[in-house]
């Protein structure tokens, strides 16, 4: 059985929660063959993997969203295809309509090999653009509007024209571009389609666009509408849609996902991983707080640094460890380094990428100040090491800290996001009471053991994979997958397989 995992902007290039989940999932099923379709910004990222690929991953195929020279993994026909009335209405529905004719669009790009550049520069797209302009944007310069509209549909076109992997099951780690690629591949080859959302993609993009400086205000609603249409395509065409917690499932329903397709599947971690890690040095007077995060804006590291600055003034024993890579957004990371220098604050350590086993035992508590999360693996990993956590009230952090249907008690402290004062208060409080830290750590350990074990996640996804395989009459392999000789060492990159 071959599973094609489809991920945008994460595995196997970026270290983080979603990437760790994907890597763990592949490792849980050595009997299955996996291919990875990786959606990335451009070919400059090609092949720069942050993970060593497991032996049952036989292919990595890349889709570049910002590469005007890329042709989707195949050579395009040189002729100009004139749209039929049905095809024109399908493309119009993508831009204007509420209900998109995705099947006609898929056929247009895959079977008729529509030239994306010629379409965007041609009369059919111009006619659609003029209609949108007259309906909604008549007060702005038309040429600016036209080029903005082209820029919106260019990355979607790259996703639609790519040459998909043939597989029995397409497993998308989000909606958005991943969901479109999975929907297209499922339509083309008949494989089952599974969507597993860690955060709710549409809401995350909406928040990002509202705050973004690169999107002019007048176009923000249009961008948001397009992401909603893309997500709705995935919801409607999927065989099953999973979420990590009940509130996320409710958001999926609000965004149009059919209720009967939804299922809650919590994350899982190996609770034995940190059983024998080294602890604090005897007599160490410091209170070590660890943030196992990527140094990126979504983790709100600047708020963390500012909060620590004020907490440190109240308790000199505090020491902050920011444990994770900073290469993803070097400009933001540099701003964080400069903020530490400007505050003249002591005892903040940036470690870069680490092995958690070497650090987590030395921590008294963990902290997560994100402005957006799903169900953070780092909190669950901390619980498995009996470490309490300070977390912002985003995603499922409340459920993890305070519990959902259990009486284990609080496993940390919850704060509002972007609230320097409250986060500083939480650091001081957790430093002040060692007995409370121990109680919280034990509560977290009991919580992770009861509901968030990797064995439970494996069992859940084994049942889902078997259910979808059976529906497509695909036999379930019991033995470990062994690559064919020609596949040994043959991890490919989509841009190289034209």
Map each language-model feature to its residues.
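Aromatic "clamp/platform" in nucleotide-sugar-dependent glycosyltransferases that forms part
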Residues: 371
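Nucleotide-activated donor-binding/catalytic signature segment of Leloir-type glycosyltransferases, i.e.
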Residues: 333-353
